[in-house]
Each structure stands twice: as structure tokens, then as C-alpha cells.
């Protein structure tokens, strides 16, 4: 750790404090994540170390690069490449004008490329949200914290006792499904796509049941026809209110037909029918995709 000079605290992630730091030997600016684990007494689980070490192999232009893993007396530091801003801050800064559609399209395309790459290596994210999508001044967007959920679990609260958001969580997880797939990340990205377009969260639930009911009120309460097996999921209740599905033109009014078609496939209830990242990249919505540069206020 003595090789790094902390420059400033840049945030508080799910697992610990994140610092902007400088490598004293190379001058490289990095993001330093200090991982706080409940197992402070026993040290860092070897399974977590193994999982994290595998992530160093995930090299892709749309994945935040894990440069190093530093394990010293019961603490774990992850050294990542540094990016200027996260998508949440960028959306907040663009709240009045909105993000231009060509930039939304570029961001979604890049994120799907990153997901397709990770999913092809059987790595899930499980906790995608605007706060862990990072952008730079050149128009790139990258997925951060990939694979950390598998190494450390997804806590209910962060180490500072903040509630971990449910807004982007797939319905199969909310319904208690223990075995889920890459489709959970596509759901999260669909919610983020809608949020970039409308400038507000699609399903801003404040509890698991509120989260489910917000989804049901928009997409209709799922049944065996749209989602075979749903009624036998651990947390499914026959007493759930029966809501009808809303028209997507009312849900995301600014989007054209291609955009609505892609979004509805990303938000398919049945994870087996939900579009894959690879298939989404070939969707007509992206036939005119470009790579514009954002106006970042840093």
C-alpha cells in the first residue's frame, strides 16, 4: 500500500470507501477500493481472493480494469483504472436538458458489449446501477464492480448502513429465485436505459414488495402464461393484486418503436425469454449507433 498516495475520497461503494490515488512509482492515477468485510476478525476468505483474482483476466474496453489486488493484514484493497464520473452524477447534471438520444444509444450499446463479454465468460454482475457505470470525457462508458457480488455477496446494507438499492433488481431475484442467470443483468440495464430516456427511475421501490408491485403495475402482474413457473417461486403469493400491462408508449414516451421493442425484450418477465446481450447488440435500434462525446462538468 505504501506505493499509493491517496489524493481524495471519491465515494462510498457497497463494500467500502473509494479513493482517487496516485501510484508513486509510475505516476498513474487509480481508483483504490478498500473492501470492508464482516469477517474482519478471521481475515479475507480465500474464496473471495480466488474470485477476485479471476477478475484480473477480464480485459474489455467497456469493463473497468482491475489492475491489482492488495491483501494486507485482514484488509483487501482493489486497484482499478480511474474514470472521471459515474452515470448517476451525469444523469443528475443532465436532468434539465436530458441526455441526447445518440449518446444514450452509444452508452447502451457499449454497456451491452461489456455485458456480452462478461456473460460469455460466465461472470454475472448482479448489482448493476447507474452508480457503478463509469464514464470518461472521450464518450466511453464502463461497467465497474463486475464479479464482486459473487466474491462478497450482495449485502442488504452497505458498510455505512445505507440501504442497497432495489430499483434495478430483476423480478426473479425479488421472488426468491436462488438460481439466476445472466438475464438479471439485462433487466437492470433495461431499467437504466429507461431512466436515461425519461430522466426518472423506472421502478423506484422502497421495499421488496413495493419494488415488485411497481413492476407489476407497469408490466402487468405475471402469470403462468407470460412466465411459466412464476406461481411456484418461493415468494410468489396468489393474493398479489392483478394489474394490467401498460402500453410502452406511455411508459417511455420519448422512445421510438425500435427503442420500445428493445426495452420490452430487456424487461421480459421470463428470464429464459429475456433478450441476451449478444442478441440485443444486433437489434435494429443500433443500426445508426455512433460514439458522441458527452459534455462533462467535472
UniProtKB/Swiss-Prot annotation:
Key words of the record: Acetylation, ATP-binding, Cell cycle, Cell division, Cytoplasm, Cytoskeleton, DNA damage, DNA repair, Endosome, Kinase, Magnesium, Meiosis, Metal-binding, Mitosis, Nucleotide-binding, Nucleus, Phosphoprotein, S-nitrosylation, Serine/threonine-protein kinase, Transferase
Chief place of localization: cytoplasm
Consequence when changing residue 160 to A: Abolishes activity
Recorded coiled-coil stretches: none
A cellular component term, taken from the record's GO annotations: Y chromosome
In-chain residues carrying the UniProt-annotated modification Phosphothreonine: 14, 160
Modified residues (N6-acetyllysine): 6
Comment on bound cofactor: Binds 2 Mg(2+) ions.
Annotated Protein kinase domain residues: 4-286
Function as written in the Swiss-Prot or TrEMBL entry: Serine/threonine-protein kinase involved in the control of the cell cycle; essential for meiosis, but dispensable for mitosis. Phosphorylates CABLES1, CTNNB1, CDK2AP2, ERCC6, NBN, USP37, p53/TP53, NPM1, CDK7, RB1, BRCA2, MYC, NPAT, EZH2. Triggers duplication of centrosomes and DNA.
Name of the protein this chain belongs to: Cyclin-dependent kinase 2
Amino acid at each position: 500500500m505504501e506505493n499509493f498516495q491517496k489524493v481524495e475520497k471519491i465515494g462510498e461503494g457497497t463494500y467500502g470507501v473509494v479513493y482517487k490515488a496516485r501510484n508513486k512509482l509510475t505516476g498513474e492515477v487509480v481508483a483504490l477500493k478498500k473492501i470492508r468485510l464482516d469477517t474482519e476478525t478471521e481475515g479475507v476468505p480465500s474464496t473471495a481472493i480466488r474470485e477476485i483474482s479471476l477478475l484480473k483476466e477480464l480485459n474489455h474496453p467497456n469493463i473497468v480494469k482491475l489492475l491489482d489486488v492488495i491483501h494486507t493484514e485482514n484488509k483487501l484493497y482493489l486497484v482499478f483504472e480511474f474514470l472521471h464520473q459515474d452515470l448517476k452524477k451525469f444523469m443528475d447534471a443532465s436532468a434539465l436538458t436530458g441526455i441526447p438520444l445518440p449518446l444514450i444509444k452509444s452508452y447502451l450499446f457499449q454497456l451491452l458489449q461489456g455485458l456480452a463479454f462478461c456473460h460469455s465468460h460466465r461472470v454475472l454482475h448482479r448489482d448493476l446501477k447507474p452508480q457503478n457505470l463509469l464514464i470518461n470525457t472521450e464518450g466511453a462508458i464502463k461497467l465497474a464492480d463486475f464479479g464482486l457480488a459473487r466474491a462478497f455477496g450482495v449485502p442488504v446494507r452497505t458498510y455505512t448502513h445505507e440501504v442497497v438499492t432495489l430499483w434495478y433488481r430483476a423480478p426473479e431475484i425479488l421472488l426468491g429465485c436462488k438460481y439466476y442467470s445472466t438475464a438479471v443483468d439485462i433487466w437492470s440495464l433495461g431499467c437504466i436505459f429507461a431512466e436515461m430516456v425519461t430522466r426518472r427511475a423506472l421502478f423506484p421501490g422502497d421495499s421488496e414488495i413495493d419494488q415488485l408491485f411497481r413492476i407489476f403495475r407497469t408490466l402487468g402482474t405475471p402469470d403462468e402464461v407470460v412466465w411459466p413457473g412464476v406461481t411456484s417461486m418461493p415468494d410468489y403469493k396468489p393474493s398479489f393484486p392483478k394489474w394490467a400491462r401498460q402500453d410502452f408508449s406511455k411508459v417511455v414516451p420519448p422512445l421510438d418503436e425500435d427503442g420500445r421493442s428493445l426495452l420490452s425484450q430487456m424487461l421480459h418477465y421470463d428470464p429464459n425469454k429475456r433478450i441476451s446481450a449478444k442478441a440485443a447488440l444486433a437489434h435494429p435500434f443500433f443500426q445508426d449507433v455512433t460514439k458522441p462525446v458527452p459534455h462533462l462538468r467535472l
